[in-house]
């Protein structure tokens, strides 16, 4: 019998997660033999595709759900600070690769777009002002501005102001140095960098159909989507970074840590505008508050998008429900993911989240006119003929066991790894791509602890001069790292492009 091909690492899925981890591992140890396996015929074809996500460089600057308000009125800014520092870690990696000289222009994947929060009504205004006062005290948010002056808002977001009632009580905050990120372009840059490296392959139209233990590693069964042929690869480490498909693959591995996890797929839709006369009037990402009873991923926002050099506007998201785990997945994905170990948590979540289910169904049933009503809260003069509906990527929210409720629905990301560190999977969604680098560093520390503390420590320090905890507490270092990243990524205020968008 022919011997299986052997590699050090197999990464499943050619999206932002696998591409980041693969390039990072190659930087830490250029001798590693890596293989990326992707079922689609190109990279970044699912959630990393620029039109399958909002492209917000999530840094806690404008996302109001990152600063939740408790029943007593207090506001917690910890999550916003943490995500801000995580994004700064991502920017350190991109800046490092750009400065190396073989990564091309950063402007191909990241562009300066101001981040704004916008609220209506006395309650909303009170919340935003309190949030601003708290965030402003932290060095990461020192440049944030607040206004209730409609003339100032007209300057910040001119498309959104005409047609409003004169007595409407509104407020906004603005951070000029926000970003729009084309995660598809970034992913493909990383994959090209990987493909140009020795002992690294990216294989498309190849689907993982089996995972079985092989001593201290894994045997990965891979099927050719086109020919139907199959091969087996032995790997010391396997990463499941396949977006919505990560859960079924994790279940396939059979590791004890996978027991009890389920998935709740949520689809998304956007309204998109390419009319240059309208697009030029809005150069910002403006986030507001989710409707009462709506889930956190439904926070509405009106965004500038820069994709392949072309600027468009995007509004949404409008949520929906399907049983597919991927946009190009199967309607059987959800039913086939049910196991004896997760049926309890899944039923508990179904019982406790009837409001969410009703919300998703109502979103699916919306007419174009109803969708435009939501848009007109932001842009009162919006006309149907300027906007078209786009289907976004799938997000599989995590269902996990809970000792009290039986099961809970978790919004966010979760890294699940085998006890021996030989396999890891990334489950969940937001803030996702923006904090990829932080999550992959956590994976490296968890699955390669000896190397992270030993042979790889110096290189990690070179790539990442400051990590999240230090960035959160050392103001001078934060500002230095941030300025260095701005310069390397062509986001400094002195750059012509930065001036154009700010």
Swiss-Prot record:
Gene Ontology process terms (BP): tricarboxylic acid cycle
Secretion signal, residue range per the UniProt entry: none
Keywords: FAD, Flavoprotein, Oxidoreductase, Tricarboxylic acid cycle
Reactions the enzyme catalyzes: (S)-malate + a quinone = a quinol + oxaloacetate
Cofactor(s) the record lists: FAD
Pathway it works in: Carbohydrate metabolism; tricarboxylic acid cycle; oxaloacetate from (S)-malate (quinone route): step 1/1
UniProt keyword Oxidoreductase, yes or no: yes
GO molecular function: 2-hydroxyglutarate dehydrogenase activity; L-malate dehydrogenase (quinone) activity
InterPro entries (alphabetical): FAD/NAD-bd_sf, MQO
Entry EC no(s): 1.1.5.4
Coiled coil (UniProt feature): none
Chain segments annotated as transmembrane: none
PANTHER family: L-2-HYDROXYGLUTARATE DEHYDROGENASE, MITOCHONDRIAL
Family the UniProt entry places it in: Belongs to the MQO family.
Protein name as catalogued: Probable malate:quinone oxidoreductase 1
Natural source organism: Pseudomonas putida (strain ATCC 47054 / DSM 6125 / CFBP 8728 / NCIMB 11950 / KT2440)
Chain's gene name: mqo1
């Amino acid at each position: 019998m022919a011997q299986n091909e052997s590699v050090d690492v197999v990464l499943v899925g050619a999206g932002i997660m696998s591409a980041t981890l693969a390039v990072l591992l190659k930087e830490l140890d250029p001798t590693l033999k890596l293989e990326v396996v992707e079922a689609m015929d190109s990279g970044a074809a699912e959630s990393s595709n620029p039109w399958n996500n909002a492209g917000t460089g999530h840094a806690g600057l404008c996302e109001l759900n990152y600063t939740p308000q408790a029943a007593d009125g207090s506001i917690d800014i910890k999550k916003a600070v943490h995500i801000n520092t995580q994004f700064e870690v991502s920017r350190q990696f991109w800046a490092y690769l750009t400065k190396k000289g073989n990564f091309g222009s950063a402007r191909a994947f990241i562009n300066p777009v101001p981040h704004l929060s916008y609220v209506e009504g006395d309650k909303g205004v009170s919340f935003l002002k309190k949030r601003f006062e708290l965030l402003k005290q932290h060095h990461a948010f020192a440049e944030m501005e607040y206004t209730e002056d409609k003339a100032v808002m007209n300057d910040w977001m001119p498309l959104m102001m005409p047609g409003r009632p004169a007595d409407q009580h509104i407020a906004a905050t603005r951070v000029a140095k926000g970003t729009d990120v084309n995660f598809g372009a970034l992913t493909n840059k990383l994959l090209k960098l990987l493909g140009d490296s020795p002992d690294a392959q990216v294989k498309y139209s190849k689907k993982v159909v089996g995972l079985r233990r092989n001593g201290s590693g894994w045997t990965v069964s891979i099927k050719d989507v086109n020919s139907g042929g199959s091969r087996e690869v032995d790997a010391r480490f396997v990463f499941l970074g396949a977006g919505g498909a990560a859960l079924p693959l994790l279940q396939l591995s059979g590791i004890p840590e996978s027991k009890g996890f389920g998935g709740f797929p949520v689809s998304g839709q956007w309204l998109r505008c390419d009319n240059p006369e309208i697009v030029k009037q809005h150069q910002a990402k403006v986030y507001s508050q989710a409707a009462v009873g709506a889930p956190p991923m439904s926070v509405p926002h009106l965004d500038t998008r820069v994709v392949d050099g072309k600027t468009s506007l995007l509004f949404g998201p409008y949520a929906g429900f399907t049983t597919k785990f991927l946009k190009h997945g199967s309607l059987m994905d959800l039913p086939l993911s049910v196991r004896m170990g997760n049926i309890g948590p899944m039923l508990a979540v179904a019982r406790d989240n009837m409001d969410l289910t009703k919300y998703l169904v109502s979103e699916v049933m919306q007419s174009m006119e109803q969708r435009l009503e939501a848009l007109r809260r932001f842009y009162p003069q919006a006309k149907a003929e300027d906007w078209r509906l786009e289907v976004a990527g799938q997000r599989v929210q995590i269902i996990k066991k809970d000792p009290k409720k039986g099961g809970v629905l978790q919004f966010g990301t979760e890294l699940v790894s085998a006890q021996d560190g030989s396999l890891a999977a990334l489950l969940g969604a937001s803030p996702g791509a923006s904090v990829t680098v932080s999550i992959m560093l956590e994976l490296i520390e968890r699955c390669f602890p000896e190397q992270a503390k030993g042979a790889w420590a110096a290189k990690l320090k070179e790539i990442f001069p400051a990590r999240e905890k230090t960035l959160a507490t050392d103001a001078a270092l934060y500002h230095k790292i941030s300025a260095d990243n701005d310069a390397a990524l062509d986001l400094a205020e002195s750059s012509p492009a930065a001036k154009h968008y700010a």
